[in-house]
Amino acid sequence: MTFPRALTVIDDNGMVISIIFWFLLIIILILFSIALLNIIKLCMVCCNLGRTVIIVPARHAYDAYKNFMQIRAYNPDEALLV
């Protein structure tokens, strides 16, 4: 089946359509890489937020508990072997 000659504007053997598809592919790859970078940035923000909201207050609470209960740091020289 051949394409009607009356509808052919330029006989370029598909060069224009090929270039359009390559540009679309490049644009899609650029958009995908931008989305991937945004996902990585979101993971970093969540990690920092988790550390700020959960880990640092828990560490402060544990330090306060250690000071209140007078728990000393582990010293291998003072450890008793039973």
From Swiss-Prot:
Residues that span the membrane, as ranges: 20-40
Topology, Virion surface side: 1-19
Residue intervals on the Intravirion side: 41-82
Quaternary structure, from the entry: Homopentamer. Interacts with membrane protein M in the budding compartment of the host cell, which is located between endoplasmic reticulum and the Golgi complex. Interacts with Nucleoprotein.
Cysteine pairings via disulfide bonds: none
Pfam families on file: CoV_E
UniProt-recorded name of the protein: Envelope small membrane protein
Keyword annotations: Apoptosis, Host Golgi apparatus, Host membrane, Membrane, Transmembrane, Transmembrane helix
GO CC aspect terms: host cell Golgi membrane; membrane
Job of this protein: Plays a central role in virus morphogenesis and assembly. Acts as a viroporin and self-assembles in host membranes forming pentameric protein-lipid pores that allow ion transport. Also plays a role in the induction of apoptosis.
Location within or outside the cell: Host Golgi apparatus membrane
Organism: Canine coronavirus (strain Insavc-1) (CCoV)
Keyword Hydrolase part of the UniProt annotation: no
Family affiliation: Belongs to the alphacoronaviruses E protein family.
Keyword Transmembrane helix listed: yes
Membrane topology: Single-pass type III membrane protein
Domain of life: Viruses
